[in-house]
């Protein structure tokens, strides 16, 4: 009943467990009421965590367009930050204070190619609902601003269903 009155919903999944059976039931209900959703994958620092694997499960099991808006830097106990695909920069947390402080840095070289691919997928997905952004994407994708991506993300939220981010 609450779902029919809601403006949106956050679906939390564990990076190790992925999509669980109760998620499928709740997802179908949200589909019925056309509730926009944002996904959140937590426990990225656990053994066996797989952010992109969880996104793939959401696509395969729930039929959603799970669009990552971040990419993890490191896996399991080496999880130390994220690449923000909207801002096109990396955020690395400091271990000594359990991540309450961080540095904003360039995207690590070993993640640049994957970050570029995922950013392209994100922009393509949201550009379906913003013709100006779509044109700009094909003409000069490097000129797309953070604000343009945020605005298109807002417009497309109900259609994409689940922009997805992560944490430990």
Q: What is the meaning of each model-derived region?
A:
Residues 1-11, 158-168:
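Single conserved hydrophobic/aromatic residue that forms the stacking wall/gate
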Residues 5, 9-13, 17-20, 68, ...:
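P-loop NTPase switch module centered on the Walker A-proximal segment
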Residues 22-29, 40, 50-61, 81-85, ...:
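Alpha-helical scaffold elements adjacent to nucleotide-binding pockets in ATP/GTP-utilizing enzyme cores
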Residues 110-157, 161:
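Non-catalytic, charge-rich alpha-helical accessory subdomains
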Residues 47-103, 161:
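Canonical P-loop GTPase G-domain recognition
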Residues 9-24, 31, 35-52:
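Conserved Switch II/interswitch segment of TRAFAC-class P-loop GTPases
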């Amino acid at each position: 009943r609450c779902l029919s009155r809601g403006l949106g919903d956050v679906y939390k999944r564990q990076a190790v467990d992925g999509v669980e059976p109760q998620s499928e039931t709740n997802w179908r209900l949200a589909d019925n009421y056309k509730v926009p959703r944002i996904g959140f994958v937590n426990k990225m620092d656990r053994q066996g965590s797989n952010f992109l694997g969880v996104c793939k499960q959401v696509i395969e099991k729930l039929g959603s367009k799970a669009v990552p808006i971040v990419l993890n830097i490191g896996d399991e106990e080496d999880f130390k930050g994220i690449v923000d695909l909207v801002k096109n920069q990396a955020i690395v947390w400091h271990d000594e204070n359990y991540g309450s402080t961080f540095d904003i840095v360039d995207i690590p070289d070993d993640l640049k190619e994957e970050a570029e691919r995922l950013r392209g997928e994100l922009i393509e997905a949201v550009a379906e609902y913003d013709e100006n952004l779509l044109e700009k994407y094909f003409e000069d994708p490097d000129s797309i601003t953070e604000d343009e991506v945020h605005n298109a993300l807002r417009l497309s939220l109900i259609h994409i269903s689940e922009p997805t981010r992560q944490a430990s």
